[in-house]
């Protein structure tokens, strides 16, 4: 057996077992378990885990902080889609600043340092952050659906206010769904399947409650993964269908103008789809592993090296989702890329005067266009005011 896996087999049972019961990332945290033998993780493995978590935290905080700063500092970036994306960044920051460091600490020390109250608070924050991420992506997909499939229903006069209200509702719903975690999460006694030891850990239910384990894992998988992604898939199917039809049905005299509008919305929809795909890929192993544990281990936890390796991989991948969104935007959005570079290089130059707010620009355009075709100008203003690709 490779030396790395031999070292893994000798890791603290508490560090292994505390990973074994989680929901979305609400897992069991070790609380000063006494071991039957004096063993500790290999230094190479411990260093690798520590560096990985440090990179996730540092990169995630940097990227999301710059994203939020760009949104509040650059007026042209304060559009409907960007309000949701900024809300998503706040949720990611919450996870990175609280849950990721706590999770990393389990590999450095073998005692839970945050008490019973910390168990409840961390459980609540973890599930709230997951809810904010997936539900914001769902609402953002619905917004793209309305922008492309039903553009005449857009209300630009109060779009920003309504969008802020929706973002707040997403946070409230996420906190309400996470509230039971804070209520029922507590310190329970766990045992190791390969070592004759028991220990206290933070979990949303006692390990001996088979029905609770299975029900909890299924509800988390459905509410925080399957149902939202199914809704998003339905929205994007309708979006793709509409864009395909519009390619062949646009009038010849409006071909150039309509083509620009369609391309603009396609790029924004593509950006949202990439964020959704990143969430789905990053969180799927975590959910699968939790379902497997819930239906397999009821009285003890698996402390094998392979199980530990799979768990660390799933956790790191899930946490990574909180730091990749800003860099996906950097890759997909030219305007965000420009402002991101300015913030990184500490450039304090103000944006050109031509980069006015979408509402101001559309108003001027509307006043000029009224002299020509009033009806068409009103529709064009509505479609372009907050959904121009250069101002996602």
Swiss-Prot record:
Mode of membrane association = Multi-pass membrane protein
Membrane-spanning residues: 41-62, 82-102, 121-142, 163-183, 220-240, 272-292, 313-332
What tissue expression does the UniProt record report for this protein? Expressed only in brain, primarily in cortex and forebrain and at low levels in the midbrain.
Main subcellular location: membrane
GO CC, sorted alphabetically, is: plasma membrane
Q: Which SMART domains match?
A: 7TM_GPCR_Srsx (SM01381)
Q: Does Transferase show up as a keyword for this record?
A: no
User: Which InterPro entries did the record assign?
Assistant: Bombsn_rcpt-like, BRS4, GPCR_Rhodpsn, GPCR_Rhodpsn_7TM
Location of this chain's protein in the cell: Cell membrane
List the cysteine pairs that form cystine.
119-202
A Pfam family of the record is 7tm_1
GO molecular-function term, one example from the UniProt record: neuropeptide receptor activity
Q: Which UniProt keywords apply?
A: Cell membrane, Disulfide bond, G-protein coupled receptor, Glycoprotein, Lipoprotein, Membrane, Palmitate, Receptor, Transducer, Transmembrane, Transmembrane helix
Question: Which residues does the entry place in the Extracellular compartment?
Answer: 1-40, 103-120, 184-219, 293-312
Regions of this protein lying in the Cytoplasmic compartment: 63-81, 143-162, 241-271, 333-392
Residues linked to a glycan: 9, 26
* Superkingdom of the organism of origin: Eukaryota
Q: In this UniProt entry, which residues carry a covalently attached lipid of the kind S-palmitoyl cysteine? A: 346
Q: Which family does it belong to?
A: Belongs to the G-protein coupled receptor 1 family.
Write out the function statement from the record: The relative rank potency of bombesin-like peptides for this receptor is [Phe13]bombesin > [Leu13]bombesin > GRP > neuromedin-B.
Please give the name of this protein.
[Phe13]-bombesin receptor
> What organism does the record attribute this protein to?
Bombina orientalis
